[in-house]
């Protein structure tokens, strides 16, 4: 079984942006270019508004498609893998030590740190909100099993209210979290 670490840019977000770009272009053509049902100043205003919306949506869509391809684990750049592996290289747990990964998403960083630290264990927490619905506790557990990692566990948690006593962890990681 192969792990499924997903992508930092959710597919649903890409589809929504593409739909928004197409809609703003259609409205620009209908009201701005062809002036169907409108004329004069209103046509100009609608043309400017929908033209601006189209440009903004198209540029943001272009950037998100580029980011999606860059962050893909299966793509050419594999930027996520480089970042995850590069971060995990800096985590060294003592014998019996415990590390915490805040905002673990699909478990990639938690699992990478656990693989590099078989003498310890890693705990991954995430709130797994609706904006990243493809990430879940179950996905993390499946990814750990796919990687053959047994020294990683996952649980629901909140980065703003960590439910652990002070001094519980020997290392703490967090990646792609504080942008939300």
Predicted regions and their residues:
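Conserved SAM-binding loop of SAM-dependent methyltransferases across substrates and taxa
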Residues: 106-118
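Class I SAM-dependent methyltransferase Rossmann-like catalytic core
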Residues: 62-83
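A short acidic, Gly/Pro-enriched loop at the edge of an enzyme's catalytic core
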Residues: 160-172
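N-terminal auxiliary segments of SAM/dcSAM-dependent transferases
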Residues: 1-59
